Amino acid sequence: MRLRMARRGLRLAGTVNMCVVCLALAAAHGGLAPENVAMVVNADSWASKAVANEFVALHHVPPGNVVYLSNLDSYERASADTFRNGIVKPVLTVLTQRGLAAQIDCLVYAPDLPMAVDIRGDFPEGNPPESVGPFASITGLTYLYEAAFSGETEYTGLDANRYYRAIELPIEQPTLTAKQMTTFAEAMGLMQHWEWARACTFLAALAEEQPGSALIHFRHAECRAAAGEADAALAALAKSVDRGFHNARAVQHSPHLVPLRERAEFKELLAKMEAVVVKPALVAAFRHAYAWTPSGKRAADGKGDRYLLSTMLAVTSGRGNSVDEAITCLRRSAKADAASPEGTFYFARNEDDRSTVRDGLYPSAVSALHAMGMQAEIVEGELPTNRPDVLGATLGTASFDWPGSDSVILPGAICDNFTRYGGVLAEKGEETPLTDFLRFGAAGACGTVAEPLAVPQKFPSPFLHAYYAAGCCLAEAFYQAVAAPYQLLVVGDPLCAPWAERPTLSLEGLEPGAEIKGRFEMRPVITGLGEREAAYYELYIDGARRAIFPSGQTPAADSSQLADGFHEIALVAVLDDAVETRGWVRVPVRVNNKGRSVTVRETKRAAVAWDEPLVVRASAPGAKGILLLHNRRILGTIPGEAGMAELDLRAVGQGLAGIRTIAVMDENRTDTIFGPTIELEVVPPPLSPAIEAMDTEALAPVLILTMEEGEPPVTIAETWAGDWLGKSGAAGKAFSLEGLFEVPADGVYQFQVRGNFSPELSVDGETVGRPEPGYWRFYPVALAKGMHRVRVLGVAPADHPDLKIRFGGKGTHSLGKDRFFHTVEVKP
């Protein structure tokens, strides 16, 4: 079924500055390369910057494609207004100002951006239908950005994604009107509450209006059976099968159809459905500028819906992974790219509703993978067991223990579990989180951020793995497999494409490090095409797309339009295959049209701790000043034509980084010289040693709150709600909160703090931070294995003091009895 309304949302705009005469950009072009990805980072979060730095370094994402946000209200959940006007709109505005918007096809989020979006305010009286739910995911809503900015709520439609590769049913399904879709949703809500008579009335009317809809007839059959009308139910089920319904497992396990199971007609219909093998639609290349029609085809006239691929690289708070786990995951994924790994795709089948809602398609998915030369297998149970070769997994279970399966997830794998709360990653969540897949080796995983009501359109179809194996990148594969992605949180490396057959590209006439003047040409030499051809080439200079050349035309550009100094020339070949595979080559060059340069004393630095200043010395004759930038952010300035500056590396974050030097020759900063990039690695400071070892069994599982002199200390067992100071009698008083905690290994851990006042946080006697009121602040601490001491000092406001403090390595949790101790137990 297809529901479509006019899209009146935000649309990406951008221009390409042509430096040569070449192919016009009226039609955009497909594929996904690092130049097409925008990286969104929480500038206040150590974890966010560390994971983003790794992704940028692994994939050579251009510095201009990285956008930083700060002072976010929450890193877990945002309002719909904050999502639109505090996250997506500012990011797209920056990309437009940098002249990059037209080339961006994917927004990828680093950790500590809100995972969920509260969409209740988009509905009348803040009350969305039960079938819709209160929350969307940041990745799903970003993908549906046009609809999300439209002022309507059609982004929650079960067929909101026109890029979705619909299963090729024997009979084409009709398009429902907006009114009919609303009526259908109301009927589903009535069935949830066992109001069979009213639901049957709605569904009977819809069946009359849309007699070709297999799904309407199926739901009508369920409703009639539950109401005790067996003959009417069988008649409706027969109509459903005649119109293409084929999910025998859903019929077998529907609790509403139990009264029909012994009827001969029912068994005949089951046999008819079981004989059907369906095929997925052909894969399609993605570009945000491609418009999609209600039938899932690319609109030749450009009139249709547009999308932005989106994933979150990692989640490192709540029930998330550690930063080290996230970085390891990204490195495994990068190595798997275009590696054509060998192994098996597994589909785990069991009697849980979470399985039966999708596993009717398992045989067809296995057949599709076999036709591609891949190994695929249906296994009975919750997990594949004792399998050392898991290339991908589709499950349906509330909870699972992957280590207990003795199976091995191979690099590049996508793992997907149909369950209610796999994407609810805040602490105290239910069911196994999607992050367990990433912890044990997957490149990507997904889960819904709110109760999905077992609606299959909200999850990937089992054909997800077939799209991935066809050469699509991870992000493309996910969004071709999900009809209604608004609740689905997708986590992983969007660029990972293990089965992409990338060509090898080199350039003749442009050597690395070459000095160029005036007009220059480059002759691409491409191998590894097989029977394919290059459709066209894209020219990028310093990460910005400058031109597009048809195959057969010699790419060229005029360097006089560039500042003197160091630049990077990238040529991307886009092939004429189904997914518009891309191959690229990057060449560093030096432009010298005016004989000007910037001198930097040291351009390569060994590891530098983030708590040490980076001293930069540079000169450029005649300069008004020299800017020092990291990912287009100005971190410091050297005044005049020579001098030094000290940079605070905490702004850069942990990991590999490049500090760009740019000399400014006029007051308006329009005349510049591009100096060399200082390459360095930012590392943690020395580990804080553990305090004297203690037996945790002899300690009390509490923290101790002391207040003004003469008042007895109070034990604190839980701080999750944030109002613990007021409940403990500390309102308006000076206080000290102390506790002990143990870390299992050497490494970097993090505290997350937010309050309506500014306390002082210290670890092992060293001040870690004094967060300003109103915002989450993130403090990394390098700790040796063993016991450590935390202390919080402050004066609580007299009126409703609020303070939340979280700590962790693999995710984060509120300070409390589960992980913190004290040497003396005090009566509460």
Regions from the PLM with identified roles:
Residues 180-263, 276-277:
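Alpha-helical protein-protein interaction modules
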Residues 573, 663, 792-794:
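Conserved structural position at the C-terminal beta-strand
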Residues 681-750, 754-828:
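Extracellular/secretory pathway-exposed regions associated with glycan biology
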Residues 545-552, 636-642, 769-773:
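Short beta-strand segments within Ig-like beta-sandwich modules, predominantly Fibronectin type-III
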Residues 491-525, 529, 588-611, 681-684:
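Short, compositionally biased P/S/T/A/G/V-rich stretches that sit at domain boundaries
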Residues 31-204, 208, 253, 271-523:
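Cysteine-dependent hydrolase recognition
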Residues 559-566, 649-656, 784:
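Surface-exposed, short loops/turns at beta-strand junctions within beta-sandwich domains
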